[in-house]
Amino acid sequence: MKATLAALFFAPILHGATLTVSDPEAARKAVRDAKPGDTIVLTAGDWKDTDLRLDGDGTESAPITIRAEVPGKTVFTGASRLRLGGSHLIVSGLHLHNLSGSKADWLEFRIDSKRRANHCRVTDCALTAAPDFKATEKENRWIGLYGTSNQLDHCRIEGKKTKGTTVVVWLGEDDPGNHHLHHNHFGPRPELGKNGGETLRIGDSNSSMMDARCLVEENLFHACNCETECVSNKSCSNTYRANTFIEVEGTLTLRHGNRCIVEKNLFLGNHKTRTGGIRVIGEDHQILDNHLQDLEGDGFRTAITLINGIPDSVLNGYFQVKNTLIRGNTMLNCKHSMLLGYNDVKKATLPPIGTRLERNRIVARPGQPAIETKLAPETFTWIDNEANAEPTGLPTQSGLKHNSDLAIKSHSTPALDAFGPSWMR
């Protein structure tokens, strides 16, 4: 028995073959013919107007790797696009820059409608547009996630100016979700001036009742100022954890769907105009241990906002807020700390119901209330909350302690180069 265990422990690790290619057709064939554990190297240089389709099947223990010869030096330009299909592929070190000429996504986790990517990973890559770059398309998206159990991590994504969400998770019968987006740097995106400019959207109205079970964690969103919804949740059972939002003129919005968790996120407005926090719509959400500081937004961009619902709402309307747990959050020096029962839609007449506020701390600005109410909430539970100011529009709550000397430790802005691809730091 000991001899058998020793043999297993010291068994040699078998490495796959490595093949270097310099054009899209050679890359396509190399990935198609690759065996689990093989590595395909894409030569450094300008891969202009390249439609690169990478379709292959590795295994969990031996994925097929497609990487840049030198991280960041294999650059796709012009009318290029990248598509992945199959399973257990890892793509790393590529730079998609100033792409134009195609209305299709820059990067898709599918070859076509019949061949999706599952259990694939794009890591240490960049998708960027220079400040002076003018795309020819009026509308497009940059990244589309399809299939299931894919990863997008340690990437830099910035500079989109045209209409269209930057990153979309698509859901459906063949696209159940369960994706993991982490350690990405979502850089500046200028104001669009209309809807359709989200940085990240998971689902849409039609798929909003699906359990997507996506995990979005430890990403940086910096100056993503495209529209009110920086992150737009439109599905159920997603988790947004430990992300950092710096000077974002928008919010993490639970727009459609139920049972999502928003926890341990950091929102730093740095007194930039219209910077926002968390907007809640729907049922059974949990807003836990978030820190929101120096935000200048109001209305939908309030630090934490609970929205009024529309009776018998359609899927793309406003469902009533029900049974939300708001616990352990800190709000420091925000223009508006918490807003209950708000909506700018006249037919939204259903107030939040069944909400539990527990162990939250609020330090409001001088002369500002801790909590503002537009439409009185129903059946709220208040436990061990503390604020330096009184609320407005609410009766006295034994579970909301007034402490004019309450202090909350402020957070400093983290280093921006701690996120994204290693070769861009």
Locations of regions flagged by a protein language model:
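Residues at the C-termini of beta-strands that transition into short coil/loop
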Residues: 22-25, 69-70, 80, 100
